[in-house]
Amino acid sequence: MDIFSQRDYYPIPSDDVIKYKHMVHKKWNKNEVIQADIPSIIVHLSSPVDSVDYKGFSDFFLFYRNFLTPAELYDYLILRFKWCMREIESYQHQRSGDNQLRIGKVALIRTFVLLRHGILNHFADDFLLNENLRLRLISFFNEDIKSDMKVIVSCLISLKKAWLHAMKLNWDNVLFNEPAFSAYTDWIDYKIKDVSQLDMAQKRNSRFSYHGIQSISNPDMRNRSILSIYKSDNFDHMVQSNSNKISRNRTPSTLLFQKDSSNSEMATVYSNRKGAQKKTIALPNILTSELDRKDVMSNVTRMSHIIQDAKTLRSSDVNKIIPSTPAKKVELILNTIYSPDCLESENIQESLNQDTSSTQKSFPKGIMSLLARWKKNHKIADPKIRKPVGFTNKREAELDNFVKYVISISSLTNKEEDLKRLNENLDSKFDILSARTIDEVEYLFRLESKLLAQLSTMQKTTRTLSNDEFNDVNVPNNIDSKQISAMDNLDLFRTVNGVARSVISLTNSVNKLNNLSDHSVLDRRRVKSSMPNFYNRERSLSGLSNYAGLQFYDASSEMSAEDDKPQKLVFHDGVDELKNHLTQTFTKPGSISNSSPLKKVLPNLFEHPSVDSLASGDACSYVTYDSQLSQMGTVKKSMKDETSRYSNYEGPVLKKKVAYDNLREFTFEDSKEIIKNDTSSLIDILNSPVTPDLSILPQTPTGKGSVQHKKKEKSESIISPASGRISIAKSHHMSLSPNLTKLKEDDEYVKGDNSLGQAEDELIRLEKNLRDSKLENYNTVVAGNLGAGSGSSTPLGDSPTNVFELPSSINMVESDMDTESFESSFEQRQPTNLREQYFKSIGSPETASPRKVNSNNAYSQVSSQMSPSLANKYLFSPDNESLDIASPVKNVEDLKSRFLKGNNQSASSSQIGASINTSVTATPKNNDMFGSDFDKNGLKNIMTASEEKLSKDPVELAMMKLEGTFKKNKSGNNTGYSSDLEKEVDILNIANLPEMNANPSDKRKSLMLDRRRQTMFNIGPSIYPSNTNDEGYDEESITDDKIWSLIAQYHIDDENLLAKNHANHVPFILMYESKDVAQQFTLIEREILSEIDWKDLLDIKLLYKGPNLTSWLQLLIQNQEFTGIDLAVARFNLTVDWAISEIVLTTDLKMRRNTIERFIHVAEHCRKLQNFNTMMQIILALNSVVVQKFTEAWRLIEPGDMLLWEDLRKIPALDWNYHALRTMMKTVDPLKGCIPFIVVYLSDLTINSEKNTWIVEKRVVNYSKFSTCVQIVKNFIQKVQWSSFYDIIPIQELLSKCIYISSLSQDEIEHLTAEFAR
């Protein structure tokens, strides 16, 4: 605080700490700061001696963040304010201190003005998101005031009021309980609280206000707020309109005039140029002006409503070509080329001498030389000099050449005939660049639709999802029957970025489903209580268009909301009906298969005679049925009629369950309650004529330990308990068979039950050894099946076999870990515990060797062709004789007596709900499948496998833990690969469940039955962390690089869109008037430049360093990450490339001439509209080397257009640092609107930014650098704000075409240019 009392700073800064540059203006005379240290700047701004420089400290609050933090600045201001208070209190009672007292008071008031200015005009930048700084200011306001000086108290009260005003302006629904505005004494004692300090009652429902959000997110509003604090004298001087009436009502001096407040409203009435109508224009006002609706934290694009509401580019067709209208008419009348000598005079001779000397100058070669000579020949001389009409001289040859090469050629071409010819050939032509834009947009939506369909199918295959879950991931149920329309009623500006992010998110989801981890495998067992709708896919799937026997009915449409929850199972069927109607298999003559070895595990198996009418390539479908959700028995009459050819086959079916709350209670009812007419749907499915293709199955080796199989004549139907879901898979190696034969029960198989029972005892004895054994290559097999370690699995979309189409045969298994029907293909004794079943199901080394005899396991046939996500759907399957030991309602023995009927009995009625397996299998006549030829040597090798290898198997570890036999090694280390499996075992507490039997087989039968049900219906606890972004957006994983790479993957598939098809290209601008095109580009440029924030300009950084953009879609994708400057520069370059591309692609000579002329006219109209940005884009394109090479087209251009082009091409000349262009922009009429040429300002800012910030590091600031920068920024945003005076009506179709532009790549341009040169 004492620093302000030092000699260098009191009362004003000395020359030792601050340096000035004397500035003289017609209205003021002041010293401008060049360099200074921080305290001297504060003293200078609150100087008690100099006049108030409101512009100076307004500029300071714009650029101070380049060398000071807001906290540091306000600390200096608070210190200055307290120093002034001390000065006033020290000298208020001293007679000799009048001067010091006056200095203190003036400095106090000016410091107060600085603080109030920062609070009112920069609250959003400094305080809105900075709680610490807010608390620091509040602490200063709440300090006790001991002074009785009114000036001090008044300043502090005014600061409190300004602070509360700013707080209320930026927050809604906040109560500060401040005193009445006029309660002077109450304000002295009032203590301000921050929003974070208020009680809940005071800030309930509080939020950022619309004004607050816009103040930190809307560049256009921020720019207008900044301009509103300046007078018009602070800007470039502007030429006023010639209309006195307009000048009186609204002059440039009133455009941005506002003295001290940035938030007051000012509207001015002015009349248009005809004076017939008055308009009211609201000047920059952050409270009343129409603003964009957007959230500062959202990813919504920042573009304004003009571009956002533009219709989507729908067509690239060019229906007609409008004739070119010259922007400037030139009439040349040559009456004669003879000049009589008598008319010569001295004055004429002097004129001739001057002209002759000037014509002797060397002109450049080419078209421009001809034009320059023509202009010189027709230059208007001094009007006092009279020239005869027929006068001629040495310029005669030049004039003849002009007539020959310009006027004659132009007059020889009949434009009406040319135009008629061009319009006749438009049927097969279109704008290739517009078509590319449409194709690029549709590429995103095609990719999203493909991923949605793929993800939907994968989810249906890997787990059952409810309708709500499909809605969560935005997967439409009818995605196959009706594809997403990419272009119908679509606002690309609002959605294209979201589509790109959706595609990336969906890609991540598909990859997750393609590459299943251990976590995913376990998660698949947590089945959801719902079934997706498949009927929408029925008609469109390949290979089954003429097949009416396989129909699916959407039962969920008739289920009430009460049914969509865990329900009580009610099974309806009889034993005999099940045996007679649900066990049908079809075999190929001579094919061999074994009946299931799991006699004890999967009881009540039936064998039937085989069918002899099968052919190679027959089909087998696989369906699992969710008895909880489906209503297979109640099919509509229309559905029944479609499958009437199977209606004569009657049998029991699964009925919809009655809605109860507990799934662990089972009710068994008599089959007489079944309604016969409700059986059509299931019977249609079960009667499907299906056959297997045995050629795809692995062969069983012959030799020791194996027995040659005989001709297969028996088949089986496996029944296993599970929940059941309907899932469909199709293997393309199968085809439908027209044959249908009902199989009978194989009584011989039942006789083999005793032998299987004996085999079970031997397996129990070997169980412990099998647990501790493993071959070395087993880990590789497991990793491949889990999808975790193999990189060879292809994405489903690229797979040659689409396993998600409608199946060719049906395999209905009700299993919570469904599809675990293990059937063997060789006559050796098979293991019956779960682990050995798992080894067989995934192709363990024992069964992975080549086999001589084919296996007819329908599941293995399907899963062998499926992706890992489907083939490894579940790894465990409980035994049919498992006991529900954890059931809280039913006694285990009671369930056993009611649920299991015995080994030699037909399947019970309960097993209808438990399992239906109509697989394509076969059984040999020899029922003694497990003989004495068991390969004990092979088993010994397995037994000797090291435990170290076994410990790496997550499934083995989990199963050992389940059975209570797991022991950690000495090191205590366990692989993280199996952590999820172990967690599930621990949390479910399965290992500690009471054992009903000491028999290992009984313990194995009870494995996870009740706990599995709890997991399946989400009754038990969840062991996995919730991941709400599994199928949704994972914002952290969706980076700009991923979005850009997504667009980079786009390539043109349609040959019609390639550059080699240039003969069919017609630029769309030929369809419209040049003035309309110029106006629409003006609207676009206005919106883009309004996205440039003043803060970005002050700290200019061109962030974009990527490849050149060739389409507006690429700009849209990266728009959210672009600064306003990057967006404007990218659009500028894209427009230049687009104009060049349109000309290069046009091969017809006269059409190219028309295109060049149209661009010249558009540029001229842009100049009249004071749209200097678009004007420069077109001029740079026409003046490029590529376009200038088309000399034949330039020769055909109208003389008036050539004169106009000569004037235009001089504008971007670099002479005197864009002197011509700067002069044009300084002399604009603001009421007409203005689009400044941004490159000029960026060039000035870039050069200025190269200056040093510090003269003396961290001590003396290069103040002039920042004051210059602020002047450039203010002048730029001022001109951008003038664009609000444009009164242009958007033409939606043309506006869309002008927005969504594309260009050729540089390689394509070079290739076409080289081709045309030949």
Swiss-Prot record:
Gene3D superfamilies assigned to the protein according to its UniProt record, in alphabetical order: Ras guanine-nucleotide exchange factors catalytic domain (1.10.840.10), Son of sevenless (SoS) protein Chain: S domain 1 (1.20.870.10)
Region feature Disordered, mapped onto this chain: 694-718, 842-861
Statement: the UniProt record of this protein carries the keyword Oxidoreductase: no
Pfam families reported for this sequence: RasGEF, RasGEF_N
Cellular component GO terms held in the UniProt record: cellular bud; cytoplasm; plasma membrane
PROSITE patterns attached to this UniProt entry: RASGEF (PS00720), RASGEF_CAT (PS50009), RASGEF_NTER (PS50212)
Keyword field contains Transmembrane: no
Signal peptide positions (record): none
CDD domains: RasGEF, REM
Alphabetic keyword roster: Cell cycle, Cell division, Cytoplasm, Guanine-nucleotide releasing factor, Mitosis
N-terminal Ras-GEF domain mapped to chain residues: 29-164
Purpose of the protein: GDP-GTP exchange factor component of the mitotic exit network (MEN). Fine-tunes the timing of the mitotic exit and couples this event with cytokinesis. May also be involved in proprotein-processing in the secretory pathway.
Family: Belongs to the LTE1 family.
Protein known as: Guanine nucleotide exchange factor LTE1
Taxonomic source organism: Candida glabrata (strain ATCC 2001 / BCRC 20586 / JCM 3761 / NBRC 0622 / NRRL Y-65 / CBS 138) (Yeast)
Gene: LTE1
